[in-house]
Regions:
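Glycine/proline-enriched, intrinsically flexible loops and inter-domain linkers
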Residues: 5, 23, 63, 190, ...
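Phosphate-backbone binding interfaces of nucleic-acid-interacting proteins
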Residues: 1-207
Length: 292
């Protein structure tokens, strides 16, 4: 069971080094399988604003960019990308930066023109379009001004500013297959109070679900309770940035707001969930049974 320290700290104040947290949890009976610093694979990559573009004098496919990276002077970077433009906010790997694919970026010259870094694509940052749905992935990644500011560390932008601990959960502790379950154990181990929050269930424009849907549970020995709820007027869209960050940190690929919230609840509460598109529910009925 993976848990990010930032998510854990929403429930209990354990502002201690990760080594101390692991030691306490081991003493409480939990084996630590791994500890991962998400920011360790990438350094010195920041959000930069392209101030000026001009053609390379000796290469038709290269452009010379003057980029504001939050310092006193713009940084010059030569790129072969054709999707960049003046005013674009882009990931800039500066001199002596390191990328998740193992690349070590240093300043140099491209066809005789000084280049003090590299502009980065999704792949070069270790991402795919599934990590950030709804974003055009070809060429250099064009950042959203609402998600970051000039000079901001890209690790912060993509949610890599976190540490993830993977605990082995034994079969006799199913209550710890969740963020809240592990937070409860951490609170007990450190003698700290646990911060609880009660979910608020709002009404739905869909009315009574059983006016629209029938649920049959023949496999009662395997599933003694199945709860369903219908939500109307749903708009499928990318999830908020904070939610995508938490999912990625805990090893879950973001898809869209509906799928992501079911996965989020599963991780936080340990309650498996699934969302169905009502248009494709055959005969308006859900049957919970063993596979045939």
């Amino acid at each position: 069971m993976k848990i990010s320290l930032s998510w854990l700290r929403r429930y209990v104040d354990v502002d201690v080094p990760v080594e101390e947290l692991c030691e306490k949890m081991i003493m409480s009976g939990f084996e630590v399988e791994s500890v991962e610093d998400l920011s360790a694979s990438m350094s010195n990559v920041v959000a930069g604003r392209i101030l000026k573009l001009e053609k390379h004098p000796d290469a038709d496919r290269l452009q010379i960019c003057q980029i504001d990276v939050g310092g006193q002077e713009p940084v010059q970077i030569v790129t072969g990308a054709d999707n960049v433009f003046e005013g674009a906010l882009v990931p800039a790997a500066l001199h002596d930066s390191r990328l998740p694919n193992g690349m070590h970026i240093k300043k140099g010259k491209l066809r005789g023109v000084a280049s003090n870094g590299m502009l980065c694509s999704f792949a070069e940052l270790g991402l795919t379009q599934n990590d950030l749905p709804g974003v055009f992935a070809d060429g250099i990644w064009i950042l959203n001004d609402e998600d970051c500011t000039v000079g901001e560390d890209i690790n912060l932008v993509i949610g890599n500013d976190d540490t993830v601990v993977d605990f082995e959960i034994t079969n006799n502790r199913p209550d710890c297959y969740s963020i809240i379950g592990l937070a409860r154990e951490a609170a007990a181990a450190f003698g700290k109070p646990m911060r609880h929050h009660e979910p608020v269930v709002h009404g739905s424009d869909a009315g009574d679900i059983y006016d629209h849907l029938d649920v049959d549970v023949p496999a009662t020995k395997l599933c003694n309770r199945y709860t369903s709820r219908m939500v109307a007027n749903v708009k499928i869209a990318p999830s908020p940035k904070w939610l995508r960050r938490r999912l990625r940190a805990n090893g879950v690929r973001p898809i869209n707001n509906i799928v992501d919230i079911t996965n989020y609840v599963m991780l936080e509460y340990g309650q498996p969930m699934h969302a169905f598109d009502y248009r494709y529910v055959s005969s308006g009925k859900i049957v919970v049974r063993e596979a045939e």
